[in-house]
């Protein structure tokens, strides 16, 4: 299959935080979307410049600060549109320049490249994944090695279970996963790999999932690399 886009992972750091954001470049138009821009603005702008790509949009998986803190400078520099789920916007009263709310199953596009928006609550009330033809950008819903915590306002381990089951049922095994954080594995592993190495993909009963996700004294939950 000839892809219409390229994925450019960017690892960013600030103090104790390590995040992954992603530039998706439409090959023909050289237009770009950035997913969850965080911490190091120069890495994003330098990558765009090297690609000779024009930033058209920012796609946000959720509203936590470590995933949205570069929205303001990027919208000022590029006048880019900003996408976030309507549920997330309404629940947390998120506001920014050029904000566009998205519904479940809605489609966004740049050039010849399209993505389906999947509502995946659990880590937050209105988390959203962006499913391209061969790639899914999952924020803090699914990591290669785990899933997001479900302890903050709007979180729900029950909804996290449902969201992971949805990904398992609706996303093809060959699709590559690009999460917001990593515990050591590089982004871009397939859904099939997660079935083998991610315990949250292996638990099929909601009761067991919730007990395991909410267990006490979990260690290393923010040990991102």
From Swiss-Prot:
Kindly list the GO CC terms recorded for this protein: cytoplasm
Q: Which cofactor does it need?
A: Zn(2+)
EC no. given is 3.-.-.-
Identify the InterPro entries for this entry.
MBL_Glyoxalase_II (IPR051453), Metallo-B-lactamas (IPR001279), RibonucZ/Hydroxyglut_hydro (IPR036866)
**Binding positions (Zn(2+) 1):** 62, 64, 123, 140
The pathway this protein participates in, as annotated, is: Antibiotic biosynthesis; bacillaene biosynthesis
Q: How is the cofactor bound?
A: Binds 2 Zn(2+) ions per subunit.
Offer an example of a GO molecular function term for this protein.
Answer: metal ion binding
Question: Example GO biological process term?
Answer: antibiotic biosynthetic process
Q: What does this protein do?
A: Probably involved in some intermediate steps for the synthesis of the antibiotic polyketide bacillaene which is involved in secondary metabolism.
Provide the residue positions that the database annotates as binding Zn(2+) 2: 66-67, 140, 181
Q: Which UniProt keywords apply?
A: Antibiotic biosynthesis, Cytoplasm, Hydrolase, Metal-binding, Zinc
User: Which protein family is named in the record?
Assistant: Belongs to the metallo-beta-lactamase superfamily.
Record's keyword annotation contains Phosphoprotein: no
Give yes or no: UniProt keyword Cytoplasm.
Answer: yes
Q: Name one Pfam family in it.
A: Lactamase_B
What's the protein here called?
Probable polyketide biosynthesis zinc-dependent hydrolase PksB
Q: Which domain of life is it from?
A: Bacteria
PANTHER family for the chain: HYDROXYACYLGLUTATHIONE HYDROLASE GLOC
Source organism of the structure: Bacillus subtilis (strain 168)
């Amino acid at each position: 299959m000839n892809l219409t886009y390229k994925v450019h992972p960017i690892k960013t750091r600030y103090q104790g935080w390590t995040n992954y954001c992603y530039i998706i470049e439409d090959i023909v138009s050289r237009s770009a979307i950035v997913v969850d821009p965080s911490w190091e603005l120069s890495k994003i702008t330098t990558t765009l410049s090297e690609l000779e790509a024009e930033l058209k949009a920012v796609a946000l998986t959720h509203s936590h600060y470590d995933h949205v803190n570069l929205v303001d400078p990027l919208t000022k520099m590029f006048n880019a549109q900003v996408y976030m789920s309507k549920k997330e916007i309404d629940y947390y009263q998120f506001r920014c320049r050029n904000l566009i709310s998205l519904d479940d199953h809605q489609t966004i596009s740049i050039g010849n490249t399209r993505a389906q928006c999947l509502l995946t609550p659990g880590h937050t009330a209105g988390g959203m994944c962006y499913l391209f033809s061969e790639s899914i950008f999952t924020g803090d819903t699914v990591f290669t090695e785990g899933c997001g915590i479900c302890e903050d306002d709007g979180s729900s381990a029950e909804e996290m279970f449902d969201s992971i089951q949805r990904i398992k049922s609706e996303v093809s095994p060959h699709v590559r996963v690009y999460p917001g954080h990593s515990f050591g594995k590089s982004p871009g592993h397939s859904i099939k790999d997660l079935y083998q190495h991610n315990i949250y993909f292996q638990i099929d009963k909601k009761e067991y999932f919730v007990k395991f996700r909410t267990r006490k004294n979990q260690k290393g939950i923010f040990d991102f690399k």
